[in-house]
């Protein structure tokens, strides 16, 4: 069970150029001016992917990453940068550093991040320890959840697959000159496949995720943002 809450004061950024939220200078800048190797998974790439989870989507880019998963959906998964163990890749969600308190090394687990609530993921590859600490020797990953866009939108997205797999995503969002908001709910269920040979018992997985973001623009230089993300996962697994 994971709850993430953050309140961030950010300068308002121009929207007419590609923006990298994390960078060696910790300042937003265009991709073309970042002096290190960068991969961006934008909204278009996320929507076109057939994967349910962000970690699977990112792992499909084998030219940039090494990804692993210890089993089926819901089992521990991670992203390795520059061939280093995942503990050397620092992960942020909406600018807040993430870690897994249940892990001895604090490695971040990608297994519960469903893609439909994510706006983009930005990856800096190579040593970023001078900026983000020793945990960023391999690089840094910043995950950005969705925010409201001008007007009012309601979205429903449903996908199904084999082994009793279903994915439902609901959201509503909007923005005006001062305010923006996004509220999203996503549910993923699957009967799974047993990790043991000759075993008819399946390893089921359930995931419920809620994202709620609100922003208020005071002026052209100051904006306050509140970000809440709650993810609950339930996994059945075999003891070999």
Language-model region placement:
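Transmembrane beta-barrel outer-membrane domains
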Residues: 72, 111, 134, 161-165, ...
């Amino acid at each position: 069970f994971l709850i993430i809450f953050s309140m961030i004061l950010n300068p308002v950024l121009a929207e007419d150029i590609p923006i990298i939220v994390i960078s060696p200078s910790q300042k937003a800048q265009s991709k073309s001016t970042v002096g290190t190797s960068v991969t961006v998974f934008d909204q278009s790439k996320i929507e076109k992917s057939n994967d349910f989870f962000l970690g699977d989507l990112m792992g499909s880019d084998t030219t940039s990453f090494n990804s692993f998963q210890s089993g089926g959906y819901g089992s521990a998964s991670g992203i390795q940068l520059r061939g280093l163990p995942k503990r050397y890749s620092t992960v942020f969600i909406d600018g807040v550093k993430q870690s897994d308190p249940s892990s001895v090394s604090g490695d971040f687990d990608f297994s519960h991040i469903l893609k439909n609530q994510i706006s983009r993921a930005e990856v800096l590859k190579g040593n970023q320890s001078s900026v983000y600490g020793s945990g960023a020797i391999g690089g840094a990953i910043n995950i950005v959840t969705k925010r409201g866009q001008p007007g009012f939108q309601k979205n429903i997205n449903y996908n199904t697959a084999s082994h009793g797999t279903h994915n439902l995503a609901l959201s509503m969002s909007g923005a005006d000159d001062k305010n923006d908001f996004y509220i999203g709910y996503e549910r993923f269920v699957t009967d799974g496949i047993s990790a043991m040979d000759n075993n008819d018992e399946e390893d089921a997985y359930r995931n419920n995720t809620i994202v709620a973001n609100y922003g208020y623009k005071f002026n052209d230089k100051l904006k306050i943002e509140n970000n809440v993300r709650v993810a609950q996962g339930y996994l059945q697994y075999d003891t070999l």
